Structure formats: C-alpha cells, structure tokens
Design a protein with these regions (language model features):
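Non-catalytic linker/capping segments at the edges of enzyme domains
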Residues: 1-67, 164-242
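HotDog/MaoC-like acyl-thioester-processing domains
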Residues: 1-19, 125, 129-192, 294-347
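Hydrophobic, glycine-enriched assembly/anchoring segments
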Residues: 27, 32, 36-44, 50, ...
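Hot-dog-fold acyl-thioester-processing enzymes
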Residues: 47-97, 101, 224-271
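Hydrophobic beta-strand-centered segment that forms part of the acyl-chain substrate-binding groove
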Residues: 88-133, 257-302
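Hydrophobic residues on conserved beta-strands that form the core of alpha/beta folds
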Residues: 37, 108-110, 202, 275-277, ...
Length: 347
C-alpha cells in the first residue's frame, strides 16, 4: 500500500484487500474461541449479581498477518459481548424462573463494551461477574420489563439492557457448576455457541477515503447446526435475523479498510487494532439473515496521538447493519514509515 492511496476504492470482496477470511480474526478467528465457565453463583440479595470463573482458549493460528507469525490472543470484544450476556441471562433465568418461551422472546436492546487500560492476555481462571443495576417496567419492551446489567471479564467491562418477562421473583441464592447447568446446552443458544455458526461474505466494497465512509453488501450463511440454535436469549429474534455480533464483526472489516487506506499501510504491516469503546443498539425490525444486508461505516472524527515513542491513529465511528447501529472508537499504532507521512490533527 502506498501513501498516495486513491480517494475512491472499489473491491469485489473485502478479501481482495484484507486477505483470506480464514486467517483473520473478525471473519473467522472469533469463531474459534473456546470458553469454560465454572462456579456460577447467583446472589439476588442487596447487591444482586452473578459471578463465575472463566477460562478461554484460542488455537495458535487464530489470526495471522504474516505467514510465519501467530498473534498473541487476548480477551476480545466478541468474548466480552457473549460471556457477559450469558451471565446476565443466568441471573434473569434463576431469579425470575423464565421458561423456555420467555427466554427465547427476551431481547438484547443495547450493549456497551469498554476495554481495560491493558489487554487481558491471561486467559485462565478469570474473575467474571454481571451485576444487576436496576429493572424497570416498560410496556414497549418484550415481556414488559427492561433490566440493566454491568459486567466484567478480567479487565474488560460491559453494560447491557435486556428486555424480558418477570413472572416470578426468587430471592434464594443459586450455585451451578457451569452456565449450561443454568441455561441449557451452549450449542442450542446463540450467545453460547450459535454465534460461531454463521459466516459472512462482504462484497461490493466501496470506500471513499476523502469522505471517510465505506459501504458493502453482506451475505450471511448459516453453517451446519445453526438450525438447532433456537433457545435462550434472543432465540426467537436470531433464529432467522441478524445479530449484534454480525453487525460488529462485518463493520470492523470495513473500518480496517478505511484505516489502512487513510494512512497508506497494508494489513501485514499494521499493528493490533484496539477497541476502546463500542455501543451496539437494536434500532429496528429484524433483518433476515438469508437476505443480503447493506453495511455502512463513517469515521465521525480522527486524530493522531504521540504515545510511548510512537504515533497512534485514533478514530470514532458510526456504523449500521441489519437493524443495529454501532458507535465505537478504535486506535492503532502506525508503523514507522506511515507515521512519517501521517496527516491530521495531533493531540
């Protein structure tokens, strides 16, 4: 990639720019994570919460930029998203005794994810929790109630708003050996294993570097086994509809294209892209996953930050896909050759 990148870029596939899907985290790597969640404890008392001990594992080649280099894994945004939602769901299921149908109809309204000050690279025996911050009645919500949770996995944090029914109110504490013991088999739940059973083709990519925008057409394919993913939180909605995970991972690939074009670098020469904050909001009716969906990304601000002897590119982003909107901020350290020619406000 030269530093005199064209203002307009048209690609038949995002792979033409970022490389094969099976070597990249946001296309395939996130689906290769394995989770072990143990010692799940629900305490509905004065400080209502659910706690657990979590270990994660990734294969060595979970993401590659150069043929001979395996990147070091850490707790990812997708990991935080799905683990925190399952902990929150476990609290609701235990405390309100939600039945199978009520769990399927419960819906995620909003997700806010924040990174820690350092990446969480220790993946064994992590402390994790979701704390209930409040429940309010809402006649527009599925089930008539909205509960807000804050959660953490290691140093990463999140906030969730979940629509649900509340047929009962149980005050007894609960102890479970695993999440499956509370929620049922992970293979039948989208936020358990189901999110791994979709893959995306991102085509007709159009990036306007001057305007800091990119669009694409996203085609989603369900992998064998997805037809059984009908249980748990968002089960009714995601059996056929697009998800917040779909919105995040597809738009992140467009963000990468814009970022690399902005400073004239290639993926193989780039440094790790760090998420600082992401907000995903359900804003409309479900978009059927079987139908192509339009993805749209726009940088709402961008600047340069001298830090630890290097130069970092920071951006804030607005994006959307299939009934979800996303606002987020990301940063990466520019390689030396790109930093020498980087253009923009420095703070």
């Amino acid at each position: 990639m030269s530093t005199s990148a064209p203002a307009l870029l048209h690609l038949s596939s995002v792979e033409d720019y970022l490389g094969p899907a099976d070597t990249r985290f946001f296309s395939a790597g996130y689906r290769r994570a394995e989770y072990t969640v143990q010692d799940v404890r629900v305490t509905p008392g004065e400080r209502p919460a659910v706690t657990a001990v979590i270990s994660l594992s990734y294969p060595r080649d979970w993401s590659k930029k150069k043929a001979s280099t395996d990147l070091f894994p850490h707790v990812s945004t997708v990991d935080m998203l799905v683990i925190g939602l399952q902990l929150s769901e476990a609290y609701l299921v235990h405390t309100h005794r939600l039945d199978v149908g009520q769990r399927r109809r419960a819906r995620v309204r909003k997700i806010t994810l924040k990174a820690g000050t350092t990446p969480q690279e220790d993946l064994t025996g992590l402390s994790a929790a979701a704390e209930l911050r409040g429940t309010r009645e809402d006649p527009t919500a599925e089930g008539g109630h909205v509960s807000t949770f804050t959660a953490h996995v290691g140093v990463m944090t999140a906030r969730y708003e979940i629509e649900h029914a509340a047929p009962a109110r149980i005050t007894e504490e609960g102890a479970y050996p695993s999440l499956d013991a509370v929620l049922g088999a992970a293979a039948g739940r989208y936020y358990g294993e189901g999110f791994k059973l979709r893959e995306h083709t991102i085509g007709d990519v159009r990036a306007d570097v001057g305007e800091s925008t990119a669009t694409a057409t996203v085609t989603t394919r369900s992998l064998p086994g997805y037809q059984a993913v009908t249980d748990g939180l968002d089960g009714d909605h995601l059996a056929a509809g697009l998800s917040p995970v779909d919105c995040f991972v597809t738009n992140l690939q467009l963000i990468q294209v814009l970022l690399y074009e902005l400073d004239g670098i290639s993926r193989k020469d780039s440094n790790t892209l760090w998420m600082q904050k992401t907000v995903l909001t359900a804003v409309g009716p479900a978009h059927l996953a079987a139908r192509p969906a339009a993805a749209h990304v726009a940088f709402t601000d961008k600047w340069l930050v001298p830090l630890r002897g290097g130069l970092w590119r920071d951006v804030t982003v607005a994006a959307r896909l299939g009934g979800y909107e996303m606002q987020c901020s990301f940063a990466h350290e520019l390689p030396q050759h790109a930093a020498a020619f980087a253009d923009g406000q420095t703070i």
